[in-house]
């Protein structure tokens, strides 16, 4: 769905300026020696349901700084047999901590801006600024989380930068055998950037739920080409670069984790970055 002119400017400015409870391999690989002294003492002893419960209670508010405490609790829990695991009455806290930490790790790769007045978050890839400074065109997905994390909206911004003025009419994305069409409105949201000595135009779109899978389809292809088409039929082809691909992948990973989480988990992850 095409974004209105107001939202296009909002999106452009923001861009420019499920891990499951059963597993956390990256965290489990860390050394328990990183944990707090009291947690380390419990780790060095043979794990019991009681010691695991104690370790879980030490996790507290989940932030990335609490990773050692989460790792210590998880490592101890994994030492238990199934019967003993069933006696860990507060395992749900550990499971939630893993999920929150997974979301926070994904968001750590991105630019996250929180608006205290509107209580919303804008999440984008830091690759945007680097790309623009290098006068590169790009495809930039962008997440908007609003109403105290109740709503999650996925958007995509197409940014043309080049030596010719192009008032965009349409954008075609070719990925493998599939072609995706984005029709632009008649307003011109571009101009000439004197510092870059280049022309630019921006078009942003809100993705419908059934369209979000397009990003995965694009990433599955070795080559993705966006054709920028002007109202005067001028065209410019942009091939997705490796950094742009990584930025797109990072945003999609974060979106999938946020979308799969409960509202409570989502709020905790976002408010404790």
Label every model-predicted segment.
Residues 2-14:
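Bacterial N-terminal signal peptides that target proteins for export
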Residues 32-34:
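Intrinsically disordered, low-complexity terminal tails and inter-domain linkers enriched
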Residues 36-104:
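Beta-rich interaction/scaffold domains
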């Amino acid at each position: 769905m095409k974004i209105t002119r107001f939202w296009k400017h909002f999106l452009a400015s923001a861009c420019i300026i499920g891990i499951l409870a059963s597993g956390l391999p990256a965290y489990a690989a860390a050394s328990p020696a990183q944990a707090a002294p009291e947690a380390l003492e419990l780790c060095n002893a043979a794990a019991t349901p009681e010691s695991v419960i104690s370790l879980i209670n030490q996790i507290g508010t989940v932030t990335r700084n609490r990773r050692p405490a989460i790792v210590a609790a998880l490592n101890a829990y994994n030492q238990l047999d199934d019967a003993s695991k069933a006696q860990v009455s507060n395992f749900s806290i550990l499971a939630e901590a893993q999920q929150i930490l997974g979301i926070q790790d994904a968001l750590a790769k991105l630019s996250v801006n929180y608006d205290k007045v509107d209580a919303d978050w804008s999440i984008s890839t830091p690759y945007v600024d680097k790309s623009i400074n290098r006068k590169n065109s790009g495809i930039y997905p962008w997440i908007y989380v609003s109403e105290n994390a109740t709503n999650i909206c996925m958007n995509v911004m197409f940014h043309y930068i080049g030596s010719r003025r192009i008032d965009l009419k349409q954008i075609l994305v070719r990925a493998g055998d599939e072609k995706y069409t984005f029709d632009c409105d008649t307003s011109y949201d571009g101009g000439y950037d004197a510092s870059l000595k280049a022309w630019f135009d921006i078009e942003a779109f809100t993705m419908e739920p059934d369209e979000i899978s397009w990003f995965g389809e694009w990433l599955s292809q070795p080559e993705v080409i966006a054709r920028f088409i002007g109202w005067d039929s001028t065209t410019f082809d942009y091939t997705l670069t490796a950094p742009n691909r990584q930025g797109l992948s990072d945003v999609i990973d974060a979106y999938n984790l946020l979308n799969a989480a409960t509202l409570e988990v989502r709020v905790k992850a976002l408010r404790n970055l």
